[in-house]
Amino acid sequence: ADLSHDPKEISNFIKLLGSHEFVIGSRYIEGGKCLMNPRRLAISKYGNWFIKLILNLNCSEFTNSYRGFNLNKLKSFHLNLIKEKGYSFFMGTVYHICSRKFAYVEIPIVFKDRQKGESKIPKIEIFRTLINLFRLKLKKTLRIK
């Protein structure tokens, strides 16, 4: 709603959902951009890098919420298996999609920083995300669904 994500990209999402179950708008693949202040950019970029490193998944974007789901496949996704809440939900969704081998694709997007206001993410949420990240790593290591 703050136009950080360009609504014109939605048609690309819809087109790709014909052949994929999940589409992720990615700031960190070729063609993608993240136009935000340097501090927020560093937190976002290194946060995504750290998640990718810990979970060892072939994805570049874990924290962006600009995504599309194929509704026919969403029924078999079992959303109740995603225990992550708040902002960790975005990371948890990618983890579950990759671990259950759903067909997904990342497409480049341009993310623009909001023009007014502050980040909506409370600092405690970063701590919760770290706890959820290591919980997901444990699940992956122990091969728990």
What are these regions (language model features)?
Residues 57-58, 81-85, 94-112:
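Catalytic donor-sugar/metal-binding loop of nucleotide-sugar-dependent glycosyltransferases
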Residues 65, 93-94:
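Short, hydrophobic alpha-helical packing/hinge segments within bilobed ligand-binding/sensory domains
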Residues 1-4:
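The conserved acidic donor/metal-binding loop of glycosyltransferases
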